Each structure stands twice: as structure tokens, then as C-alpha cells.
């Protein structure tokens, strides 16, 4: 769903505004050629400003379970096209999150509410900061010209994150729409490893959009946009994002030491290193990308008590922080954490006990339970649900924990799947996997990001683009 959320807020049809008026636009959304959803945008404008209401819908299911996602978003702009306020309601598999924000001076004050979470935060805006839902208005209002390029600071409302967006108007291109020739500008956008192309007309209407991950949208009539013959299944999404290696990995859960070649990689620093994962070689290619060779070992069995690790990262307060997804201060999470830590055990033993509890008490189902509290209440979920609940319980117990996103080998699919797992600091960082019940992750766990503000976007750099080969050391 992260990928879908990002794509849903890249662009909408956005007209130029004169006097007063309103209009409605529809886009049909496809993933690798298969219809999966639509976007409806209704824009109203007057001398007092602009109001845009949008609805994004993705029809998804996992076996017989409805996993559909709907996002309703209202953005208000002042007459000079600056953000005034916004409201956002996301419903993913029946789970709701609401975000409301209002500008005061150069600061956005926003409030995020979901089950077991209600918190206000503030973020500063600069002259270059625009909301992701309406940023095309800012581009089109100044006029479009081939060769024009620039940068914008983009606030992603669904994730409450700031990212830097680079854009360039590449060319003009004529498209056919309902038997008519439409002149468009082709705009390339890049942010955090993700690249999109948008075909937009002089009046700001988006006729086509595509990403380097296989998503596409096309302007359609309402009845066409809403016609979705069959729900996109999570298994089909998994299959399409699967990374097939050069050969199957035998006994992956008992794999302790492997060497990988991964390409294309955008920079020598794109893949992180840690105590398990070391980069051996980085080779620059003619296209400017890199081949990264790295050696990955399974997590060690024991804590190294003979050497005190010099690692100040465990002191970062974000590793004990409560978030909208990890409600570590909720009374139900706190009560379970106290129950699991009742025997006065060591932090490492407590982390292992929490790992086992989450593994045994959550059914392994491909349903997105969105938050730690959802996972605890429903007792089911996929890797992200397991990781969120584990992280909430360890943070509630005072154990610094970070969330890792990367790849892991699946014997069932004979390839690498995108996966989430936690790392805990218990004198040193240790990687665990509550989904698989591993106190020490195996060598097929390839870390691509760890929880920093932009880590979800950094993961987009790899999805649908990389190839992997492996060998023994």
C-alpha cells in the first residue's frame, strides 16, 4: 500500500483558474497493464482561492479478503496558490487514518488521528514548499516551456514527509484523446529514487502519467475510469515485484554467508552497510548507475559482551518514539509489554520473548493491518504488521528498535520479496524477524533502508528495477 499511496499523490488533473468555476476530471489507474483503480478530482476556484477535492480508489483483495484502499483529500489554496489547509482520510482494508493541517505563518500545524493515536506536529514551509496534491498548479500557473527545470520541496500529505522533487520539461507531444489531437508537455519528475512522466496540456489537464515501477494513469470518462472488472490480488502484486536471482537459494533459512551482485543501483551509498552487511565492490556503468557487490552474513547467535560497541545511534530518541503506526504508549501495548517483561529478564532475552510472542500469536495472512494496535486487535497480518507490533512492544519496554525494509528470499516463489523486519539495540544492534520467528535473521535478508524520514521513498529506488545474482564466498 505504500507504493500505491505514493503514486496516488503524484499528480491530478489541475486546471488553470480565471474568475470563478469548477470542473471534474477522472484518471484510470493501471499496474503493468491491469486496471486497479481510479482518481476523481473536483476543483473549484474563485477570487478567494482554490479548493480541490480528490478521491483515489484501489481495488485490491487477498484471497477472499477485501483489501481495497480509498483516500479522500481536500486541499485549500490561497489566491497566490499557497497552501491554506488540507484534510485527508485514508481507509486501507477498513482501517482509517485522518490527517488535518492548517498553515500559520510559515508553519504547517497538522493533527494525525487513527486507532489508539492522536498527536499534533508542526513542520516549517519555505517559499519552495508545496503540497504533493496540488503542486502541478504551481508549475502550470507560471507557464510551461520545453527545457524548463527546477526543484521543489514537496510535502507528502499521506505520509507527512518532506521530499525534494526535481522536474524538467522534456518536450511537447501530441496525444489522441476521444478522436481529438491534444498538445501536451511531457514533464519528468524525480524524487527519492522514483521517476514519473506526466503528459499535461496547457490548461493543466493530466492526460497520461507513468512511473518507472509499472504504474500508469490515463484520462478517462467517469464510467470508464470506475469500471474495474477484477480486483488486483496481492499475490499478483507480489509476483510482479518479485526479484528472481540467477539461481534458487537452497535452504534459505539455514543460509549463513552469501555474496550478492545487485544492479542497477543509483549511487555507491544507496545500499547501507552494517555489522552483517558489507560492501565489497562498487562498479560504475556506462549509464551512470552502479553494480554493488556485497557480502551478507546471518545474525550472530550471542551478544558480544567482551567489546563495548561504539555506536551512538541507539541514543537517537526516534528509536523509542511513538508514531501513528507504532503506538508504543497505548495502554494495551503497554500492558502486554509489562506482562512479557514481568520476570526481570535481560533486554536481549525480553526481545527474544517478544519476537516469539508476536510470531506465535499473529496469523500469517496477506492483509495490511496498518498499525501495531490493529495487528494486536486482529491477531493477523503480513511482515509489516508483525514488525510494527514487535517494535511497539520493544519500544514500550525501553528497547531502542528500528524498522528495516529490504528483501528476503522466498522458497515458495523462488525469488526475493520486499520485506520488513526489526533491529533492536541490546548493547549492539541485532536483526530479528518476528514474521519467520527468527531470533537471528538469515543471510538472505538484504537491508535496503532503515527507518529514517525518507526511507519509504528510498525503497522505491529498487522496486521493479533491480536484478540480483548470488554466490558463496
Report the location of each language-model feature.
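Secondary-structure boundary elements
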Residues: 132-137, 300-302, 306-381, 452-457, ...
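Generic recognition of flexible, low-complexity loop/linker segments
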Residues: 171-173, 185-186, 194-197, 280-281, ...
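Acidic/charged, solvent-exposed loop-and-adjacent secondary-structure segments enriched in E/D, K/R, S/T
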Residues: 114-135, 354
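Hydrophobic h-region of N-terminal signal peptides that target proteins for export
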Residues: 4-13
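Active-site neighborhood of thiol-dependent amide/isopeptide-bond enzymes
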Residues: 30, 339-424, 428, 440-443, ...
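Active-site rim recognition segments
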Residues: 201, 213, 217-231, 312-313, ...
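Acidic, serine/threonine-rich low-complexity disordered tracts
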Residues: 14-122, 141-305, 456-460, 467-473
Amino acid at each position: 500500500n505504500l507504493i500505491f499511496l505514493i503514486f496516488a499523490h503524484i499528480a491530478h488533473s489541475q486546471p488553470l483558474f480565471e474568475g470563478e468555476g469548477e470542473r471534474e476530471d477522472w484518471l484510470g489507474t493501471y499496474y503493468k497493464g491491469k486496471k486497479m483503480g481510479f482518481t476523481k478530482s473536483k476543483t473549484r476556484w474563485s477570487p478567494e482561492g482554490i479548493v480541490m477535492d480528490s478521491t483515489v480508489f484501489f481495488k485490491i483483495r487477498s484471497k477472499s479478503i477485501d483489501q481495497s484502499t480509498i483516500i479522500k483529500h481536500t486541499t485549500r489554496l490561497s489566491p497566490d496558490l499557497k497552501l491554506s489547509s488540507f484534510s485527508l482520510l485514508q481507509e486501507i482494508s477498513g482501517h482509517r487514518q485522518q490527517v488535518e493541517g492548517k498553515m500559520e505563518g510559515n508553519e504547517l500545524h497538522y493533527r494525525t488521528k487513527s486507532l489508539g493515536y492522536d498527536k499534533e506536529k508542526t513542520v516549517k514551509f519555505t517559499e519552495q514548499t508545496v503540497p504533493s496534491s496540488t503542486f502541478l498548479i504551481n508549475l502550470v500557473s507560471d507557464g510551461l516551456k520545453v527545457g524548463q527545470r527546477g526543484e521543489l520541496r514537496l510535502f507528502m500529505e499521506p505520509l507527512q514527509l518532506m521530499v525534494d522533487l526535481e522536474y524538467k520539461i522534456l518536450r511537447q507531444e501530441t496525444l489522441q484523446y476521444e478522436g481529438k489531437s491534444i498538445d501536451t508537455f511531457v514533464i519528468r519528475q524525480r524524487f527519492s529514487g522514483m521517476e514519473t512522466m506526466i503528459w499535461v496540456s496547457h490548461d493543466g489537464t493530466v492526460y497520461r502519467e507513468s512511473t518507472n515501477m509499472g504504474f500508469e494513469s490515463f484520462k478517462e470518462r467517469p464510467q470508464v475510469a470506475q469500471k474495474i472488472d477484477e480486483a488486483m490480488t496481492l499475490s499478483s502484486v507480489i509476483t510482479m515485484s518479485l526479484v528472481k536471482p540467477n539461481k534458487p537459494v537452497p535452504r534459505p533459512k539455514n543460509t549463513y554467508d552469501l555474496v550478492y551482485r545487485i544492479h542497477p543501483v543509483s549511487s555507491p551509498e544507496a545500499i547501507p552497510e552494517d555489522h552483517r552487511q558489507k560492501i565489497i565492490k562498487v562498479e560504475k556503468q556506462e549509464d551512470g548507475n552502479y553494480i554493488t557487490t556485497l557480502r551478507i552474513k546471518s545474525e550472530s547467535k550471542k551478544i558480544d559482551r567482551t567489546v563495548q560497541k561504539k555506536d551512538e545511534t541507539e541514543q537517537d530518541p526516534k528509536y523509542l518514539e511513538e508514531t501513528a503506526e507504532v503506538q508504543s504508549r497505548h495502554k494495551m501495548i503497554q500492558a502486554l509489554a509489562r506482562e512479557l517483561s514481568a520476570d526481570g529478564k535481560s533486554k536481549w532475552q525480553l526481545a527474544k520473548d517478544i519476537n516469539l510472542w508476536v510470531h506465535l500469536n499473529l496469523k500469517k495472512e496477506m492483509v495490511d493491518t496498518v498499525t501495531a494496535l490493529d495487528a494486536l486487535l486482529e491477531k493477523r497480518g503480513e511482515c509489516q504488521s508483525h514488525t510494527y507490533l514487535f517494535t511497539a512492544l520493544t519500544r514500550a519496554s525501553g528497547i531502542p528498535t528500528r524498522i528495516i525494509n529490504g528483501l528476503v528470499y522466498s522458497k515458495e516463489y523462488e525469488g526475493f520479496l520486499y520485506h520488513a523486519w526489526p533491529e533492536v539495540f541490546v548493547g549492539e544492534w541485532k536483526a530479528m524477524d518476528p514474521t519467520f520467528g527468527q531470533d537471528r535473521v538469515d543471510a538472505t535478508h538484504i537491508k535496503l533502508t532503515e527507518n529514517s524520514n525518507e526511507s519509504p521513498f528510498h525503497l522505491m529506488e529498487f522496486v521493479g528495477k533491480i536484478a540480483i545474482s548470488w554466490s558463496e564466498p
